[in-house]
């Protein structure tokens, strides 16, 4: 996502990348892991809004309006983008004090304690996010405790807790991504 410092932070794309606001070759692809996770959430009956901040060119001020009325933000982060992502999440929490922030990706999976030390991050997902996020959001919506849910890390009473990994997922159980969740204004690369 964008931040106060730069329009685009980092995003892998086909044969290139976005880096600090500059496109370096290639064509963009949809955020497939977020799309897959959003699809699982939608099929579980949750209200889902998927925004590709880079492809939709949503700036920081617009982003504040997007998160004003939502309960949870889920962000895919990497080590390269982690500092800006976590700072952005902290700023967004200032506009929505009840906002819960969840991050997943390689950085939170391999460095869970380090990730949770940042005040902008409430919960991390370790390894594959689809079913862990589904179970987590279901527990949150039901007002139930998620402390024992495998595959997450979280903060409670100023302490960091990292639970065991969620069992490996049979990828045949993950549904085909619902591309209707993507903005119809997006123009993703299609090699076919």
Predicted features along the sequence, with ranges:
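Short glycine-rich His-centered loop
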Residues: 1-26
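Generic beta-structure capping elements
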Residues: 15, 165-166, 177-179
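A residue-identity detector for tryptophan
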Residues: 18, 154, 171, 188-189
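Short catalytic helix/loop segments, enriched in acidic residues and glycine
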Residues: 19-41
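Short, P/G- and charge-enriched loop/turn segments at secondary-structure junctions
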Residues: 23-25, 149, 191
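Radical SAM [4Fe-4S] cluster-binding motif and immediate context
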Residues: 29, 172-192
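Glycine-rich beta-alpha loop elements in corrinoid/cobalamin-binding modules
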Residues: 33, 37-167, 171
């Amino acid at each position: 996502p964008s931040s106060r410092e730069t329009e685009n932070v980092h995003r892998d794309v086909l044969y290139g990348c976005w880096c600090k606001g500059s496109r370096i070759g290639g064509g963009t692809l949809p955020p497939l892991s977020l799309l897959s996770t959003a699809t699982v959430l939608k099929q579980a009956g949750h209200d889902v809004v998927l925004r590709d901040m880079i492809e939709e060119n949503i700036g920081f001020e617009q982003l504040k309006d997007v998160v004003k009325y939502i309960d949870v933000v889920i962000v895919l982060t990497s080590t390269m983008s982690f500092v800006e992502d976590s700072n952005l999440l902290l700023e967004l929490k200032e506009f929505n004090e009840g906002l819960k922030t969840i991050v997943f990706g390689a950085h939170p999976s391999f460095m869970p304690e380090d990730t949770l030390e940042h005040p902008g991050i409430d919960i991390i997902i370790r390894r594959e996010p689809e079913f862990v996020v589904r179970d987590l959001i279901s527990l949150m919506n039901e007002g139930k405790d998620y402390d024992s849910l495998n595959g997450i890390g979280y903060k409670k009473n100023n302490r960091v807790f990292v639970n065991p990994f969620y069992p490996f997922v049979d990828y045949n159980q993950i549904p085909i991504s619902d591309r209707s969740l993507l903005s119809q204004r997006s123009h993703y690369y299609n090699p076919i």
